[in-house]
């Protein structure tokens, strides 16, 4: 999965001369929290709702309401925007984007292709992608298998047993657990009755520690 597959394409933008009040209005009217700042087709910054809040004078200020309104009415985006934001290319792998976001504590990325802003990827886009990838909105069953040795043969057996029951795998997550020196797999299967599959997993020697049917309305078991 690439960033181009999950980003919001052709996002709204403002230029650096845009008044802060106008940028705030755009965010409110379009229910968005971030705006790339583009001058003459080139990305020069990013402005967020948090930036707007920080730009607002403190309630403890000695300025009058008239003076406050005057200052805000003259303030421009270029005065409070974050300059030179970290960008990603459309073909950046999702995992790489997630790693960069965690390391740099970034909640969103402008997506730039050949110098042009073509999209934006935010926390909401990431959550939507993970929801789809994990099959959370689809009804089915969840099965957890622990104590695996990380062998390819284990994975082959799990898939083979699932196929024998003509059941679709909605998602499969494999996690290493260094503290226990083993691996754990969490399966989401397109079946309302996981018991026969669990029985065959156990016959094959797998340690099934959890199984249940879940509803898509809650996204959980």
Question: What are the residue ranges of the model-derived segments?
Answer:
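Short basic, glycine-rich beta-strand/loop surfaces that mediate nucleic-acid
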Residues: 183-191
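Short proline/glycine- and acidic-rich turn/helix-capping motifs at secondary-structure junctions
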Residues: 43, 176-183, 212-221
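A glycine-centered beta-loop-beta connector
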Residues: 27, 35-51, 101, 109-124
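Tandem CBS (Bateman) regulatory domains
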Residues: 1-10, 49-86, 93-102, 122-179, ...
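Short acidic/polar active-site loop segments enriched in Thr and Asp
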Residues: 33, 107, 168
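Short acidic-hydrophobic, aromatic-tinged amphipathic segments that line or gate anion-handling sites
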Residues: 14-15, 88-89
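Short, basic/aromatic recognition patches
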Residues: 18-25, 98
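Conserved short beta-strand edge segments in small beta-sheet-based binding/regulatory domains
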Residues: 170-172, 199-219
